[in-house]
Design a protein with these regions (language model features):
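N-terminal signal-anchor transmembrane alpha helix
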Residues: 9-52
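Transmembrane alpha-helices of multi-pass eukaryotic membrane proteins
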Residues: 11-19, 98, 123-130
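Membrane-embedded alpha-helical transmembrane segments of multi-pass integral membrane proteins
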Residues: 22-25, 29, 78, 101-109, ...
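Short membrane-interface loop/juxtamembrane segments of multi-pass integral membrane proteins
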Residues: 50-73
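Core segments of transmembrane alpha-helices
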Residues: 71-84, 134
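Short alpha-helical packing/oligomerization segments
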Residues: 83-104
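Interfacial loop-to-transmembrane junctions
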Residues: 108-133
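Juxtamembrane boundary at the C-terminal end of a transmembrane helix
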Residues: 139-146
Length: 146
């Protein structure tokens, strides 16, 4: 069988952010974790420094913050990418804008967590608003298909 998928104008921006920008951010954060691992003295396969290590060694604490920020990104990536690709079929401009906002907020979240040890210190929690908006647009798209 042959299927034809017609995408709206601007859908390329949705794909560029969902399948380009988001994985790039994950790669960057993964590299930050790798860079911070050696000074923290956390050997593989340990994912985190122990509580005792982090308490005594600021580098270990910073490593844990970077690792947790990256893990949180990985936890939120799949649904964000999926909702973008689906919602963008009906609302490409708003979806691309929310996706870009999500990327920016996730970057601020990670930077604030690593640099200042506070997850929401730089407004990074705004990613939840963007993610909620993408979910709502996905639901609206699904309702239009009924």
């Amino acid at each position: 069988m042959v299927y034809t998928l017609t995408t709206p104008n601007g859908y390329g921006y949705v794909v560029l952010i969902a399948l380009g920008g988001i994985p790039l951010l994950s790669n960057i954060q993964g590299n930050v974790v790798t860079f911070l691992r050696k000074p923290a003295n956390v050997p593989y396969p340990n994912a985190y420094a122990s509580h005792e290590q982090a308490k005594e060694n600021q580098d270990a604490y910073k490593f844990n913050c970077a690792q947790r920020a990256h893990a949180n990104l990985l936890e939120n990536m799949p649904q964000t990418m999926a909702t973008m690709l689906f919602a963008g079929l009906e609302y490409p401009t708003v979806t691309a804008a929310l996706g870009l906002g999500w990327l920016l907020a996730r970057s601020l979240y990670a930077f604030g967590y690593i640099k200042y040890n506070k997850r929401y210190s730089l407004g990074g929690g705004a990613f939840w608003l963007c993610q909620g908006g993408l979910w709502a647009l996905s639901c609206a798209t699904a309702l239009k298909m009924l």
